[in-house]
């Protein structure tokens, strides 16, 4: 019994140590709004996340008449000195970010699963990872952002049945475009908006320390890249058509000029004697 208890404590201690192997590298980012977070276990990177995020949080204030309530909104970003924690597993991972003396706690939960490819359901299964839950715990008694909040206290805003940033296993998700999530708050079911952009995330299967695997671009970025590339391709095709047209026209002119300069032979054979 004592051995089992010791073994259990050892496993728990190892888990705690693994959770503490985290680094906030946001100071290395060239974008002041973009954060860089790394979770490591046994000296190896197991989760990397780079993104810029902004929260739009509604809260109540008392109207001037002292009776009615007015809903205000505050915009919150993650500061450079935020504290982080994390967990890595074969099929579930987690990133926790807190700041302002624990007034804000942002949790991102990742999971890995197998999905059938194709609409007919006959294609082989492929492994993917996704964000399956996002949660923000915030305290409206924090008066830097929540000015004159009515009945201040802690609230929890969460997603329900989320399946976001679905990415093939072994690859990192990349998206410069903004991704918006709506969390439902315990504060009278208010909607908290989470806007994430300039993203690169990989919560599983990182092969090299501090290095993302092959990127998987979001549909929005692919569309924008196509929109940027398409005019260039069309311009090249149009230019090629113009060059071909001019070349054919120039060849036609030279051919006509050569034909005009040839001597005209008389059709009456009797005239050959005088030639």
Curated annotation (Swiss-Prot):
The chain crosses the membrane at residues 229-249. Glycosylated. It is found in: Cytoplasmic vesicle membrane; Cell membrane; Cell projection, Dendrite; Cytoplasmic vesicle, Secretory vesicle, Synaptic vesicle membrane. It is a single-pass type I membrane protein. One of its GO terms (cellular component) is dendrite membrane. The keyword RNA-binding does not apply. Residues 250-275 are cytoplasmic. Plays a role in short-term synaptic plasticity in a subset of GABAergic neurons in the brain. This is Lysosome-associated membrane glycoprotein 5.
